[in-house]
Amino acid sequence: MTGLNETDARILVTSRHLFLWPLAETYFKNAEKVLQDCGVCDSFGRLLSTGLQCLYSVLMDTKMEPRVELLTRKRICEVLLSHTVEYADVEAILNRALIIAEQHNLTEYKFSLQLLLSRVFCRTSPKAAKVLLTRCVREAEEYAKVAEIYHSNNQSNPHRWVYEFLLATLEFQNVSQVANSIHNYANHHKHQHLQLLAMILNQSLPMDEISTDSDQISILCLVTQIAQCLRKGEILLAREILPKIHSKLESETFVWPSSYIDFFIDDTSKISIKWMSINQLYLLIYLISGFCYISDSTSGRASRFLQEGLRITGDFKHQERCVLEYLESQKWINNITKDMKYYLIATYLSRSRLSKAERILQSTEDDQTGFLGILKGMYLQKRGDLKKAEVHYRETAKNFSFRTDTFIISTLNLINILEDSAAASRCLESIEPLCNKHEKKIFKLWLLVLKVIREGPQVHQSNVLPRVIQQSSEYANTQLQYISLTELSERFGKLEHAEKMAISALELAKKSKDELWCLISGRILEDFYRSVQKYDKMRQQALENSAYSKLIEDIYSFV
Amino acid sequence: MSESVTTGSDDDGGDRESSPVMLSQSFDPMSSSSNSSSEENSDDDYEKTISSKKRHPRPNSKGVNVKRSRRNAIVEEDPQEEIFNNLFAFLLDQKVDTMDIAVSWFADYAKDNQSALANLINFILKCCGCNRAINVFDVQDQDSASATLSQIQLSVERTSTRDYPLNSKNLKFRNFRKRLTGLLSNFVSQLSIRNYLYNSTVFEDIMSWVVAMSSSTMRPIRHTATVFCLNIMTFLCEKSKELLNEHAIATKQLEKEEKRSRVNRNRINELNNSLGEIVKQQDTLTTYLNDYFDSVFVHRYRDVEPKIRVDCLQELGVWINTVPSIFFSGSYLRYLGWMLSDINTTVRLTVVKVLRKFFETDSFIGGLRHFSSRFKERILEMSCVDADIGVRVASIRLCNAMRTCGFLENSEILKVLKLILDINPRVQREAVLFLCKVVDESVNEKIDLWGEEDYILKAFSQTSLTTFSVHWIKFSQMCKLLEEVRLSYQSSFDYDTLLRIFQKNGNFITPITQALLNACEIDSIYQSWEDISNFVLFDNYTSTLKDPIDSILSFCKLNDFQESILLQLLSASIQTVCNNNFITPKTVHNKQAAETTNDQNKDKDLLYLNLLPYINSITERNSASPTLLHDSLRLLFSMDLTEMTDPQLSRHFELLINNLKKFFLTNNDLQIIQGCTILFLRLDSIPALKEDLKLLVTDICDQTVTEFLKNFGSFNIQDAVITKDEFVIFEACLTRIEGCTSLKDFSDYPEFDIIYERLVSLLSRVPNSYEDTLKFSAINTLQSLLFWFFLRKDNPADEEKKKDDETKVFNCLINIMNNDSSKILQLQAARTFLETVIMKEGVKASHYNDDNRVSEEHNFLKPQFLDALLKILEGWLYTYAKVGQFPFKRLTQASSPHTQISLDKNPLNRRLLEHVCCDLTSKLLIVVSLSNTITPEFSQQFCELRGHYGPKLSAIVDEFLN
């Protein structure tokens, strides 16, 4: 230190953080780049470790200011929590930092440290996390009240910490409860953005267009609205919203700055919530688009969306900046890839693309949802191997009885192929309460149709089937439409309506490439023409039916 | 830093894998903990070890001959002469303020620092009870402190005494510690004010002597010096805390000054200088604290003297609370964790209390999770099985604090909740307090989930469920938790049978009921018997399709077991309300007392007028379930029926009596029949009901006799095989006849002889455990019949018949005691035999005065009878010893092994077995006393039982021996 006087030398020594902090951040940024490019690798670990060593060096200074120590410890904890599972170390470092914040009345810093501590406790001691966050919410609310009274302009919005702590409770509370808490608080303090967040979390957004300047929030709201529709089975309504998302994504002014979405409490204070990167968003949109059209078996739109989504999963680029987010993203991409495969298989099966479906089925691993079992059963059913299909449906229903959706779908399919009427009736009785109570009305419609089919054409059900046909149109379920039309036309006998319905059913089945139902509805139409003595039309229809019968025989010959 | 006097094998404070003094894992929870005074450890071994390793003092490089000659002079001084020290004298003088003492010393120090320092050291020596003194030459060289102290120690050892001011009971030392603490506080304060703490060596000079003394092999010196050091460290911590506050203030001031638009450089420089000074002082204090912690605490917390260990741990707790930035970390908390396993009770208790404060401090939660995960198993163990009750109670409180922080898992919470059934009342009560906290927390979570209390009440107000109360949620949660606790203990047939025997008089309080009584005392909400009654009577659980109403009703819907607990809660609530509301204050004036009594009578009548209809409704509602009906009937056991004199109650009583009659005659459950019998007996005490009840009882007895004759009149009791269906019928019939014989004298019945003969024949059946319950009822019935016999003043012609009947019964009982395979039946026979003898002796005292008859009655307690009784008692003591984990003590010389009945080792069974053994022992000793057959051998046998089976049994034996 030649040339420096004592005062300057002391300042230089006690201000080492001014040099080491930026240096540490440089290492962290480089580590993030390596993580995005190469994933978790040795060089990433070395960079991270070196950055942490810089921060630890700051702590070696016994003369540093308390605030410096606090901020350094906080940053160390953030890094450790983001990239490691060294919870014991984090706790020890945080404990000291919390004491400093308490001693120096650094309330805002204390809240931020408590938030970090709650993240640790969520993994190490969930009960303690619950207790801690409950206390923190109470403290933050009191702090906000006092801060509002004194109108402090030097700090961020005091309400921020209430929301942060409430959101942190998502780790151990159900979403609706947290959403209600946020909504009540935001409503009381007139924080519109946070009210919107509460509605998104609770999936209770109105179907009206949400006016917002943020593209991210706009997309999030649209996706939430679609999710609400899909949860209720309102496919047509979901399809109406889907073009808005596509339009927004294709807009030249569309901006997606990061994976975090900001909800502003006021003009300057905000809550940032991790959602997904732009790459993840495109994948999600493809999945949603495919799902919206999966029930429309008359066109190949669903398969095109899903195929494109699967294609770009192979080119997926991670944009996460920490290990935990990276691992979580990897898990997410694996799940969405699997979902796309499942839905694509279902699409192919619904359009009788058996070879394509088989190819994907063979490359798909078993899952824990039971959906694959249903798909295998559907494939075997399409091939005409009803016995094996029955086995798959029964196993799926038995093993996944705790998952209501899976149980209902597998049982409905099972009922459809059972030759034993008594067994089919028992199955119907077992799922009837579940279907009646289920939020998705489509299950109830399918139940009604199967009951009518099982009762036979002798029973004239003039109210059920028309209602089913009408509602199936609303839910955009093509298969349900042509099956219902077929059954209804059979019951109308010689009436003129029978011909119209049979023709409609036949047309829908043709578009869906469902040879079996083409044959069924074709025969009904043939019988109708015979009964009304329209022999020319009858012969023409008979030729078509013969062709369908030949196709089906070819399929069954492989069994 | 100064060196210790000795260089033993002290630990250097590194991380430890095990605690320094391991606590034995096989504690006997029933034995009382020994007092601290009895654990005065001898220092001989310790001192010998230390002496063998003692270093020779280093040669003084200065070679001052005068110093050596003066040291020799110290040794040669007359040891009997009391050396005066002004500081010590002032300290003992209660009129002198400790601040004045401190100030005067500093004034002396300013004049002559060496003399003042020597005086202070001598003061410390006086506080140690050491009648020796040093001079100014000794304090000139601080390095010689250890050597000087060694010489003093050698000279003092010959005249050492265990009595020194800190532990002396001498009146002149009664406030010694308190005043010493005050003096040290003021002393440190003055050191800081005068800057001696930071800019002078005087503090270090003093502390070098104190630290050296703290390592002395003499306990008085070591203890006193340790206390000095610990207290000084405490005050240094307080000073450090003050500096932290000053630092925070100065920092904020500096920040504000730097942010001003017009910067005041001078002010900023001034603040910077001030901050620098504060930081420097903080560093100095931190250095002191760390050094003295390593020099003194690390060694003394493991001292052989428990008091020293206690002081260390107490002060460590203070330091952590005062300066958490230094001491609140795992490096220091671990010392507390290790000492949880200390062998001394006071040490463990101290640690537990210190830890509880930490867990109750919100800001400490972040640093306690790791500690909890490491030591909570030990804390739970202390709660459940520690040898000292006080430690257990304190540990339960600590567990509650840990639970509040979220550090206990559900399985661990259940472990503590099980203690509500513990045998010790203090542990019970503390565990119930824990239970109430758990319930409150769970209920609050539920209410928050359903949308707050106001929202819930509003939702229910819009429905037809007008009786709903939010407290139902609490009652429901309590019942569910108690069910979980109760089901964690496996109930056995033997337990149920024993419980039935001792529930006969209706006064036996089940452990669950006792826990609920404690809960009622702790939380007044549980005293809301009206809310509980409405909850019991509510049965409209159909779905309303309204949330949260459906969720709440679904949560509040209880199964039978839980409803049983709810009824016990209602019983406890009624008992508590009656006891709390109708106690006459002792200090009230007679006139006021009379007025108060009248008011209480009116209140009582009003209470009963409101309560009885509820109970009638509850019994009618639960009539289909034997278990619930039994618990419903027990509600009436909670009430003092003799107090019910209001005429308006007659209608309700009439309904109650009719219901009881119906239950008695139609129900086949044994508990129901017994319950009805008890209530009939109690209702008989109400004058207004006597006539009606008499007619009703007569009718009941007639029908029961008819039933009995129908079932047993022509049945070959001794040899016939009883089918399962017959067994059920017979069991109910015998229970009813048992009840009737309790209610009415059967000797006037023409069928009496037949009944008597049939019952005796039943007892003569071949032993069969399947039919034990039949014999239970038969034994009880015969006992009642004999009771009525004894009460009658018959003419001499009937005496012979009475004797024959007695002989038959006693022979049957003896046969059962000797030959029956059922130990419970043996117990019942023994109890009946003893009770009958006691009863007969009591009746005889009011009927006969003839001494000759007295001598004749002693024949019943023949040697073979006594042997049989002792054998049975020994068998039950053996079982009690096994379940309670006591060492078994034989009563007889019989070599046959004892077999234990199938009862698990848990508090429920232990409580019941304690009751069984105490009951049997007390009755046996009474009979032996009455028969005047006490022998020295007999007394010796029971004398040896004292202290082996718990305090209750010991008290019974003591009373007998006295």
Swiss-Prot record, chain A:
A GO cellular-component term linked to this record: cytosol
Pfam families attached to this UniProt entry: Cohesin_load (PF10345)
A biological process from GO: mitotic sister chromatid cohesion
Subcellular location: Nucleus
Alphabetically ordered keywords of this record: Cell cycle, Cell division, Chromosome partition, Mitosis, Nucleus
InterPro entries per UniProt: MAU2 (IPR019440)
Single GO molecular function: double-stranded DNA binding
UniProt key word Nucleus: yes
The keyword Hydrolase is annotated on this UniProt entry: no
Main location: nucleus
Self-association and partners: Interacts with mis4 and rad21.
UniProt record similarity statement: Belongs to the SCC4/mau-2 family.
Record's function text: Involved in sister chromatid cohesion. Forms a complex with mis4, which is required for the association of the cohesin complex with chromosomes.
Protein name as annotated: MAU2 chromatid cohesion factor homolog
Provenance organism: Schizosaccharomyces pombe (strain 972 / ATCC 24843) (Fission yeast)
UniProtKB/Swiss-Prot annotation, chain B:
One Pfam family linked to the record: STAG
Residues covered by region (Disordered): 1-72
Keyword entries, A-Z: Cell cycle, Cell division, Centromere, Chromosome, Chromosome partition, Coiled coil, Mitosis, Nucleus
One GO term of the biological process aspect: mitotic sister chromatid cohesion
Domain SCD: 297-382
One GO CC term, this protein: mitotic cohesin complex
GO molecular function terms attached to this record: chromatin binding; DNA binding
Coiled coil location: 236-275
Biased composition (Basic residues): 51-71
PROSITE patterns from the UniProt entry: SCD
Subcellular localization, as worded in the UniProt entry: Nucleus; Chromosome, Centromere
Polar residues bias locations: 21-30
Similarity comment: Belongs to the SCC3 family.
Entry function: Component of cohesin complex, a complex required for the cohesion of sister chromatids after DNA replication. The cohesin complex apparently forms a large proteinaceous ring within which sister chromatids can be trapped. At anaphase, the rad21 subunit of the cohesin complex is cleaved and dissociates from chromatin, allowing sister chromatids to segregate. The cohesin complex may also play a role in spindle pole assembly during mitosis.
Subunit note: Cohesin complexes are composed of the psm1/smc1 and psm3/smc3 heterodimer attached via their hinge domain, rad21/scc1 which link them, and psc3/scc3, which interacts with rad21. Interacts with swi6. The interaction with swi6 may contribute to recruit cohesin complex to heterochromatin.
Name used for this protein in its record: Cohesin subunit psc3
Native source species: Schizosaccharomyces pombe (strain 972 / ATCC 24843) (Fission yeast)
